């Protein structure tokens, strides 16, 4: 029997309360009932005030306040009524979150009851943050031309179906025959200039429209000029811009088809004049967006998983090598990866900013697979030549930038020349790898540009001195560029990538600057040099080429620009002195060194000349400086390619990005001059059938503002014109070159 059973009390009774009231309980009595004392302290709980102060709660009478609360006058909360501490377990919050997710998923499935089982399954795998983003209704895009995206699901299928339905409802004049014609024009005339987004033999416009509508929309946007009404082209442009905004900002559904569409829009970008709200498209933003999407998609990691490890792993190379069937399913992704690198590299060099897609071993593996895989297309080898040439250009620019930052001033010029010659050898090796069947004229040189705006604004403008032997190289290169460009018909020019047109315009700016440099010579020498340039004849020839094509892109733009340039050139009549006085400073910043000074120049062709204010302009100075190009070893070579329609590619080593050789300023920066020239509204337009042409207030010849890239480094020998077809039998390029030189000397 328990001890408390003899007294008839329960274990929860307090027999010592009466002794506690009298206060005369002795120690012996407490020791006689140890179990009741322990029970008392185990069952009684302190009030809230005593628990907060962590002191003993002395409550003589049950139901009455404790002694401490009575003395302080505080309310004594009954200890028995105080709830116990709730033990929160982590599993409870997780279960609560899962129940909420299940509720959201069930509501989403009810809203999207029309969707198939596969779509519902993919929706169930989304994270809560993504799900809360997707189930919200889309806001209207600020384009003034809304795409009818369905419901709340922003998946790829929903976007594709929305684009397809929009095309069917709003572009009624684009029937199946017209779209097939535009698609055939893209495949036949535009793809050969840069075959990065290609299709298998037998692919039709209906197939692309059904499987990849956003890519089909991008192709219609860049290739529809001349095949449909202008209003239809504007609808296509607004839709593709709105689709890009939606994919970039309002969804995370990134696919290879979206990357292909961005590459197409960036490569063959064009403007529709006049630009209306909702039609603005930034070519630089598109290029970097494509590269960022490729990185976010981890496209490079997916391709790295197919790596064969190089020659150190022969067994793995036999199984997963570039010529194995294992690589056949990755060809399209490799083209997209190389295409993103290409357009991003061109953009970064134009903006003089770092390229976010640096060259890695993966790029080399992509080139090997595209060149050796049995499943590769014929155009893939041509694409690889484009990529390799751009890589040589970018590496050359990076090496010059590193030498500018690290080399001492005295040895900088020598190191630059050594680097220049080394990369010219790489360019020669690239030439030898090109296939047979095409002619390409390749030249290379270096150039120097200012580093920052403060240097460009430093007066007075420097003098760029040109060695006597270099003027021959200048003229030979311009002759070849002019011959290549004028040999093309306008249908071929219209299919060229946008950047080629900018560089052709820059070549003619160089021609005008050489004219004013030759006009500074003594009378007899000036006549010989000016006659050899044939500036008026060349301008008349290109204007005649482009003026007859009316408003088609890029005929109107090229005609307007070349006419303005001719107006600058002919503004002073036949008097050279008057022309020099009326011409802008950026056109007259060059001078030709007399032969006597040319003999004293050192071997690296870097010279010091005196500017107009008498200050010495040195190649190694950080202030105003002169640049004497080294072109002694630059030759114009003729080599062959083998593919069918005309092809355009890059053949020159451009100036380095994000660097300054501190050897030029605004006066010798063609881009700065071009911007000034294109903003001059006082120069009248000349030429026949040009009265209805719109005035251009900015250098927007390919839909890009020249102010965005005033430092764009296009060198004088940048022959970015398409390849020529096979020459007629018996054609001797060396003899033709000699005849051209003989005509100039006579």
UniProtKB/Swiss-Prot annotation:
Its main location: nucleus. The keyword DNA-binding applies. Residues 1-40, 109-131 are annotated as: Disordered. One of its GO terms (biological process) is regulation of DNA-templated transcription. Keywords: DNA-binding, Metal-binding, Nucleus, Transcription, Transcription regulation, Zinc. One of its GO terms (cellular component) is nucleus. The keyword ATP-binding does not apply. It is found in: Nucleus. GO terms for molecular function: DNA-binding transcription factor activity, RNA polymerase II-specific; transcription cis-regulatory region binding; zinc ion binding. Residues 47-76 bind DNA. CDD domains: fungal_TF_MHR, GAL4. Residues 1-12, 120-131 have a biased composition (Polar residues). Transcription factor; part of the gene cluster that mediates the biosynthesis of the diterpene ent-pimara-8(14),15-diene (PD). Acts as a positive regulator for the cluster gene. Down-regulates the expression of the penicillin gene cluster, two putative polyketide clusters, and one putative nonribosomal peptide cluster. This is Transcription factor pbcR. It comes from Emericella nidulans (strain FGSC A4 / ATCC 38163 / CBS 112.46 / NRRL 194 / M139) (Aspergillus nidulans). The gene is pbcR.
